Amino acid sequence: MANKESKNVVIIGAGVLSTTFGSMIKELEPDWNIKLYERLDRPGIESSNERNNAGTGHAALCELNYTVQQPDGSIDIEKAKEINEQFEISKQFWGHLVKSGNISNPRDFINPLPHISFVRGKNNVKFLKNRYEAMRNFPMFDNIEYTEDIEEMRKWMPLMMTGRTGNEIMAASKIDEGTDVNYGELTRKMAKSIEKHPNADVQYNHEVINFNRRKDGTWEVKVKNRNSGDVETVLADYVFIGAGGGAIPLLQKTGIPESKHLGGFPISGQFLICTNPDVINEHDVKVYGKEPPGTPPMTVPHLDTRYIEGERTLLFGPFANIGPKFLRNGSNLDLFKSVKPYNITTLLASAVKNLPLIKYSIDQVLMTKEGCMNHLRTFYPEARDEDWQLYTAGKRVQVIKDTKEHGKGFIQFGTEVVNSKDHSVIALLGESPGASTSVSVALEVLEKNFAEYEKDWTPKLQKMIPSYGKSLIDDVKLMRATRKQTSKDLELNYYESK
């Protein structure tokens, strides 16, 4: 039986994951007290900001790293199914927020945009063809199209076909249900909704600086006002650390055992941004390529139409950039301060295991704009230097941890949920596809750490997310029904199954 006493929840960070969690808690338990602290002057400035991430609605429609080629040449699409389901769950929750009046004008943050996969070379073409065959036979992806015809590709992505002839070996697949998501705008809308809640207190320019665990299991959270310098202490039954790159240092300050043998390595992304409106207007899709052999998923190149502040723009990247800061607005001492006696062997083991990744990162850092432009020309052969500017986007901190399966110093890709044994501290670490799957991550947090409330919360969660507790992978009828409804709620295009 759940304890019906009001609880105090402290949320650290005002990014997409924190505001998603806060939006859920205020509906599940309206009487609970929520205190949300953000060290900067407004929400969604760091990784969630629309200029600091790729803005892709990651649904595994075009991202080739979610479909893995097996030794026999067949393609495993299980990860793609999982990612697609998670994004559909996110869309359901966003649709609920719109219908309930918590947020408005969904086109401010989500727009329909076809997703295309593009490859060159005989082996890559064979891979894409096999992927197409595997995906088109599964209901989630049965609207996928495939071509090796340059004239068809000219219709799909005319900008990328300029200057090409039919002699080049290349192929593309396309799914029209793709989206571009402005996670910064979505975050701002959710933060504004939380601010209006009578039992929520949202404070900007406030930085959590330390924690003290009390004998009764609750937490004293020390918070510094960055404007005045004043420090206050607030009590919390639950501490939710959703501070992006700042999560690992904060988790370490709690002193919980789960924070040991854990570290992070900061990587930022750079993008080329197009400044020529004529070029921008020739491309109205997201096109993902294939990552170079032996490189991590974050290296997948893509040429993306983006909608930022109501205007179309065009980005290409990412190019990795390394540095010691854990946040764009962080300190050059962040990495060094995160090295502790209890995690130094973890970090050193990771360095030894991942020398190719380190070399790749260094090569990327040394790459000039000319080198970046040469990469762009593999997508858009006639790209001109004067039409593009190099921009440094957000930071991501790759989680490094010890595991039974992989030993010491394993680099964890994706989003990692870490919680204390008593579930009073919850931290979200890692990176992509975090924003796209933020709702599924929040649900995982609820299920793992608030199990005593499951009976009371399940009907409420099913109202927010109609497929909650069911499988969109296994239930085709439910998948199509929820997809049709969310398309209506979010003002997206809906395509009947072929």
From Swiss-Prot:
Pfam families: Mqo. GO terms for biological process: tricarboxylic acid cycle. The keyword Flavoprotein applies. Its EC number is 1.1.5.4. Pathway: Carbohydrate metabolism; tricarboxylic acid cycle; oxaloacetate from (S)-malate (quinone route): step 1/1. It catalyses: (S)-malate + a quinone = a quinol + oxaloacetate. Its cofactor is FAD. Coiled coil: none annotated. Keywords: FAD, Flavoprotein, Oxidoreductase, Tricarboxylic acid cycle. The keyword Flavoprotein applies. Belongs to the MQO family. This is Probable malate:quinone oxidoreductase 2. The lineage of its organism: Bacteria, Bacillati, Bacillota, Bacilli, Bacillales.
